[in-house]
């Protein structure tokens, strides 16, 4: 038997033999995202670029932070000599400027799921973790602009009708009844997600015409929304092109799920706490990228060389 230390040494030597194979061709449509890691208790940033069409990882490296300088350097390193047409990124305000400086003709798709998280955050900032059913319905109207949430909206309409029919004018008792209805909705959404997962279905995407129509109705009724969501509606309208690129170019994905899945598949939450040096981080990320791209890490011949 071999000691854990010896096996770890074999592992690191084998990883050090892995040579990075730089992409010589790409689709021109990419995900870019970041993940924060720990190195000896210090936070560092993992910068990653993935081709949306081929699925290949073009970059997976660590830097001390996610400054504009670090991001520009990473993008240039990953994409130098390759076509650059579009990116899907989250809604960080720095990304459009960075991309425009490096690639003036590149288009941007903002991650719709990131938009949904912001909408939910703004809703709970105004109303707490248990917003009124009507405000919850308004939030789902916004979710429904780019993805089809008709099923959830119909359920909320049913619950709102029951609430209006059964409330008695006693504030405390009405609030308790609304709380029961909110719980019913949460259970409904949870079961809906499970059903979609079992059946391998995603939430359907809206077409550009559907999005335009739904958003026009929201703008017309914007006075019924909370103040923060009214402001969010204005921002969506201002940046409409960055939310709808996926509807105008079939290669572009509406969310950053494609790179989030890579992060989840390659480093678990516990793994992220285990790095003791910059070398260990670089070694692990190099192995993640190589293995994802189909390189064999531990061939019989390489193991014999290590011995």
Q: Model-flagged regions — what are they?
A:
Residues 40-44, 120-122, 287:
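Short, solvent-exposed polar/charged micro-motifs at secondary-structure junctions
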Residues 87-142, 263:
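Conserved beta-strand -> loop -> alpha-helix junction used to position metal-binding or nucleic-acid-contacting
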Residues 56, 106, 122, 126, ...:
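Phosphate/oxyanion-binding loops and surfaces in catalytic or ligand/nucleic-acid-binding neighborhoods
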Residues 7, 33, 55, 87-90, ...:
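Mobile genetic element proteins and their domesticated derivatives, centered on retroelements
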Residues 3-88, 93-101, 105:
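RNase H-like nuclease fold core
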Residues 94-96, 136-307:
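Acidic/histidine-rich catalytic cores and adjacent linkers
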């Amino acid at each position: 038997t071999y000691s854990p230390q010896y096996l770890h040494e074999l592992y690191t030597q084998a990883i050090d033999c892995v040579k990075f194979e730089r992409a010589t061709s790409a689709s021109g449509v990419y995900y870019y995202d970041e993940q924060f890691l720990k190195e000896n208790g210090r936070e560092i940033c993992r910068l990653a670029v993935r081709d949306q069409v081929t699925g290949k990882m073009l970059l997976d490296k660590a830097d001390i932070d996610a400054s504009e300088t670090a991001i520009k350097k990473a993008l240039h390193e990953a994409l130098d000599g390759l076509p650059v047409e579009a990116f899907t990124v989250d809604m960080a305000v720095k990304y459009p400027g960075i991309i425009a400086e490096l690639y003036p003709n590149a288009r941007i798709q903002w991650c719709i799921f990131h938009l949904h998280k912001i909408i939910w955050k703004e809703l709970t900032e105004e109303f707490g973790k248990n917003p009124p059913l009507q405000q919850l319905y308004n939030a789902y109207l916004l979710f429904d602009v780019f993805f089809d949430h008709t099923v959830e909206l119909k359920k909320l309409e049913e619950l709102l009708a029951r609430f209006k029919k059964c409330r008695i004018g006693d504030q405390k008792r009405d609030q308790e009844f609304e709380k029961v209805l909110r719980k019913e909705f949460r259970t409904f959404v949870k079961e809906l997600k499970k059903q979609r997962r079992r059946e391998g279905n995603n939430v359907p995407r809206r077409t550009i015409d559907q999005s335009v129509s739904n958003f026009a109705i929201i703008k017309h009724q914007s006075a019924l929304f909370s103040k923060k969501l009214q402001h969010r509606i204005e921002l969506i309208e201002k940046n409409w092109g960055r939310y709808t690129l996926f509807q105008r170019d079939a290669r572009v994905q509406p969310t950053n799920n494609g790179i989030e899945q890579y992060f989840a598949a390659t480093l678990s939450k516990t793994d992220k706490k285990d790095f003791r040096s910059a070398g260990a981080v670089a070694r692990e990320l190099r192995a993640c990228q190589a293995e994802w791209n189909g390189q064999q890490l531990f061939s019989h011949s390489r193991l014999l060389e290590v011995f």
